[in-house]
Amino acid sequence: MAKKFEIVSQYEPAGDQPVAITQLVEGLEDGEAFQTLLGVTGSGKTFTMANVIAKVQRPTIILAHNKTLAAQLYGEMKSFFPHNAVEYFVSYYDYYQPEAYVPASDTYIAKDSSVNEQIEQLRLSATKALMERKDVVLIATVSAIYGLGDPDQYLKMILQLRLGDTISQRDILQQLTTMQYTRNDVELWRGCFRVRGDVIDVFPAEAEEYAVRIELFDDEVDSLAWFDPLTGEVLTRPTRITVYPKSHYVTPKERVLQTIEQVKVELVSRLEELRSLNKLVEAQRLEERTRLDIEMMSELGYCSGIENYSRYLSGRASGEPPPTLLDYLPKNALMFIDESHVTIPQIGGMYKGDRSRKENLVTFGFRLPSAMDNRPMRFDEFEKIMPQTIFVSATPGKYEAEHESKIVEQVVRPTGLLDPVLEVRPALTQVDDLLGEIRLRVEKEERVLVTTLTKRMAENLTEYLEEHNVRVRYLHSDIDTVERIEIIRDLRLGEFDVLVGINLLREGLDIPEVSLVAILDADKEGFLRSDRSLIQTIGRAARNVAGKAILYADKITKSMQKAIDETERRRAKQIQHNTEQGITPQKLNKKITDILEDSPYAPKPGASAAKLKAAEADGEYSPQEMQRMTPAQLASEIKRMEKQMYQAAKDLDFELAAKLRDDLKRLKSSMVGVGDLR
């Protein structure tokens, strides 16, 4: 019997949430293709989404525009649905340099990348959940529109065994090898298998803490078990098991052989074309590179850059969209697009950037024309397969306005907090005036966010404030995601009082201690001072009872007026609701550790208190130390500790092994958001 979504929370919907939930559910039941949840900052949009999911009982995908927000959503949804499958699907690259050619300098750049094994495991776990369960909430980034293995081919590669099945050990081992599992009779790692007599142990690629044991008697499956690979303890003895491939990109051998023949035909045609244009260097280059790929595929079943032949491997015609994560979704799936005013343009922009790079590779003989079909989805292709969709944003964009059937407002916060008080002050004296406002906030132990137009202005302002003994930090684009989280955490802890930034102080920044947002040069029309940008930035002060936003400007622009009018409209509605209900705005008491704990690797609900205590009391690294480590240091330390853990298990020191496992979980939590933000 399929599990149902069961929401777990100490809170009941409040403020505008009950009405918003009812209206959204009614819209879904009426078959509305698109709806918009216009939810202000701090109104509990994630809680509303969770309640809608629980009401409609449908598998759901939530798209976010970067890994940091995806990790926050994952943490929140995991706490709301501890008994259901909450999964995480983002780019698994810590570092990614795509293949490229620069004609101006005749420079070829080979593809270079570093894969995060923990995130790869979570991606495999996500697709497995979609295939096996209906109670799935999947948090994903724009990585969802990039090519993934064809779901039909992927399903064909699955190994399914039942008690009493007749199958030889040789056939099982051959199938595991075809699924890209590696034999390792010494140590059982994720994605490996070992053989001991008639017993085959497999550590599934998507699993985190369990492995499969297959015992044969002659050519019959005599026993099946799930066991702990660390301790060897048998957890359950099912009557059947399913082992999924190690990669989404595994392909049956027949399909690879078919691909080789198709590549040969295209190569002959393309070489004739290049030679007819007298492009002899390009023709020679293409022939050498492609013949090498063909030889590798013939011998090994794959080659470096095999994704460039994905059109043939997936059996698509020229120009057809690639198979993506969205092809794995059930037909009755529901989609939320979080911060849709940012996420939708991001989805639309991926195809164009990828195409311009590929055109150079094809034109200059580095790739066959079919490589153009190894690409992210175009936006029109994405639209065609979108399930019923709810856009979620405080400032919906043009696309949402054109496609929504109805707007559901969530303006009143459950806490009774109001949108900040707005003031417009002259830009001529903005720096000195700001300094005075900062001093007032520092006396009250409150924090300040300041947003400028350019990097140089931000640097100069930071220097000026430092000279006047203000504890200030500067947040800029060169700072990676983990360090950014650390800076925000230090701001909340009071390590410094003022944070200066450019375009980084908008969506998803949750700092209840901030009582003042200052927007310098607010009257300079443009992307950073559009009405949506202004509303989002003003919203950063909406989580504080004394929230205030100051716009420094010499004139009021159309964008400013729109932002002021919308903020005042929302504030009036909030005041009216509080007066009618007798509500006094409540200060938010969000734990400072929350921003670091909201991670796909946090200890699972229900983990024993003893294990958690061991991790907290005896962990080798404090949270601060972990956050200061570079991605390379983290990866190295994780590998070292994994070796220690398995060695401890070998030595039968299970207490030490369990402690190391818990310490590893804490270290892995620091890996979220590192690197590529797809």
Swiss-Prot record:
ATP binds at G39, V40, T41, G42, S43, G44, K45, T46. GO terms for molecular function: ATP binding; ATP hydrolysis activity; DNA binding; excinuclease ABC activity; helicase activity. One of its GO terms (biological process) is nucleotide-excision repair. One of its GO terms (cellular component) is cytoplasm. Keywords: ATP-binding, Cytoplasm, DNA damage, DNA excision, DNA repair, Excision nuclease, Helicase, Hydrolase, Nucleotide-binding, SOS response. Residues 26-185 form the Helicase ATP-binding domain. PROSITE patterns: HELICASE_ATP_BIND_1, HELICASE_CTER, UVR. SMART domains: DEXDc (SM00487), HELICc (SM00490). Residues 635-670 form the UVR domain. It is found in: Cytoplasm. CDD domains: DEXHc_UvrB, SF2_C_UvrB. It holds the Pfam family Helicase_C. Residues 430-596 form the Helicase C-terminal domain. Residues 597-630 are annotated as: Disordered. A motif (Beta-hairpin) lies at residues 92-115. Its main location: cytoplasm. The keyword Nucleotide-binding applies. Belongs to the UvrB family. Forms a heterotetramer with UvrA during the search for lesions. Interacts with UvrC in an incision complex. The UvrABC repair system catalyzes the recognition and processing of DNA lesions. A damage recognition complex composed of 2 UvrA and 2 UvrB subunits scans DNA for abnormalities. Upon binding of the UvrA(2)B(2) complex to a putative damaged site, the DNA wraps around one UvrB monomer. DNA wrap is dependent on ATP binding by UvrB and probably causes local melting of the DNA helix, facilitating insertion of UvrB beta-hairpin between the DNA strands. Then UvrB probes one DNA strand for the presence of a lesion. NCBIfam families: PRK05298.1 (NF003673), uvrb (TIGR00631). The beta-hairpin motif is involved in DNA binding. PANTHER family: UVRABC SYSTEM PROTEIN B. This is UvrABC system protein B. The gene is uvrB.
